[in-house]
Regions:
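Conserved non-catalytic scaffold segment of RNase H-like nuclease domains
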Residues: 103-246
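Short beta-strand micro-motifs in enzyme catalytic cores
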Residues: 36-40, 82, 109-111, 173
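Metal-dependent phosphoesterase core characteristic of DEDDh/y 3'-5' exonuclease domains
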Residues: 170-207, 224-322, 326-344
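OB-fold nucleic-acid-binding modules
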Residues: 1-27, 91-97
Length: 344
């Protein structure tokens, strides 16, 4: 008899096996010869496995959609990559899944996040000498220097404020995260909880420190599954993710980046800025996209990104915390709209 319900890490190669899994991330592909097939991800309480379904199987079995399925096939290796080649599949109920797995399926999650940053206080000591070299003040007579003092002071303040945009001169103040279902991957009979988190500023508006914020964020992300979960944000490939990992380096925190930012199409990441441009590397603000889509902005007359430093100086950390969360809520709405129109 065919073996089945084997823990995913223990599936042998080349043997017919049946499994019960939650299927996600289905994508149509073609070989170099033009042969149609689908790639998908199967997931249950024992692990995650890459699935491959050839066109002739799709023709006889019908469309494979995200959901709970009983599948039959063999584990094979293609170009040094193991895939479970599916020969048959049929939909199952959540009750049937629970009967074989004893627990509910681990559903794909979208982690939508945003960071707020501040310039390091010590950076001010570096700005002055850098400006002196840039403006060649040493070559000016004293009366010339006096003439430009106001301009120099304004430029020094501007350069200092921009320090928050680099991990060499800035730090993380807070990280806000929304965890919820991936749009279009809702499962019948199951409700996926949605949660919000803020690291770095607690619910009472007290600062917790950058090191703790980084640790707490990494703790939340420790079970992030690159094959089925998604990390969502606006310009996170170009800013937020590198900034977080670089600040971990500064603090000596051991971290294996859970996404590969060097990839042309970064797996496991949904960057709303890139998706707005259909993958092109161009800039657009989250606020501009939200306005175009009729989504209420997170910015107010009191708070926006450029005012975070002043709010911090005024001790209004609770306002910064709520602004950080609102940015995430807006990003989540933009994400849902893009997926609804463009798909995955």
């Amino acid at each position: 008899p065919m073996r089945g319900n084997i823990p995913i890490p223990e599936i042998p190669h080349g043997e017919d096996i049946w499994l019960i899994v939650a299927v996600t991330s289905i994508r149509s592909r073609r070989t170099q010869q033009g042969v149609l097939y689908c790639e998908a991800i199967g997931r249950n309480s024992t692990g995650t496995i890459a699935l491959k379904i050839w066109g002739e199987v799709l023709d006889t079995q019908g469309e494979l959609q995200a959901g709970l399925w009983g599948i039959t096939g063999k584990l094979e290796t293609f170009q040094d990559r193991s895939q479970f080649v599916v020969s048959e599949y049929r939909p199952i109920t959540i009750e049937k899944y629970r009967e074989h797995q004893t627990t509910d399926p681990v559903l794909p999650r979208a982690f939508t996040f945003d960071i707020e940053t501040l310039t390091l206080p010590d950076f001010r000591e570096r700005v002055g000498p850098q400006l002196e070299r840039l403006l060649r003040l040493g070559n000016m007579r004293l009366e010339q220097q006096q003439r430009y003092l106001d301009d120099i002071a304004a430029e020094e303040e501007r350069c200092y404020s921009l320090g928050s945009l680099s991990a060499t001169s800035g730090r993380v103040l807070s990280i806000a995260v929304h965890v919820g279902p991936i749009p279009g991957l809702e499962f019948v009979g199951m409700e996926q909880p949605e949660t919000e988190h803020v690291f770095g500023i607690d619910a009472d508006g007290f600062e917790q420190g950058e090191r703790r914020a980084l640790f707490d964020f990494l703790e939340l992300m420790k079970n992030f599954d690159l094959e089925s979960d998604e990390l969502v944000g606006h310009n996170i490939i170009g800013f937020d993710l590198p900034f977080i990992f670089q600040r971990c380096l500064v603090h000596g925190i051991q971290v294996r980046p859970f996404v590969n930012l060097s990839e042309f199409h970064v797996r496991g990441v949904f960057d709303t800025m890139h998706r707005w441009w259909l993958g092109a590397k161009r800039n657009v603000s989250l606020d501009d996209i939200a306005w175009a889509l009729g989504i209420e902005s997170s910015k107010t007359s009191e708070v926006e990104g450029s005012k975070v430093f002043d709010l911090y100086q005024a001790g209004k950390l609770d306002v910064i915390r709520e602004y950080n969360l609102n940015d995430v809520r807006v990003t989540r709405k933009v994400y849902e709209r893009i997926v609804a129109s463009f798909g995955r």
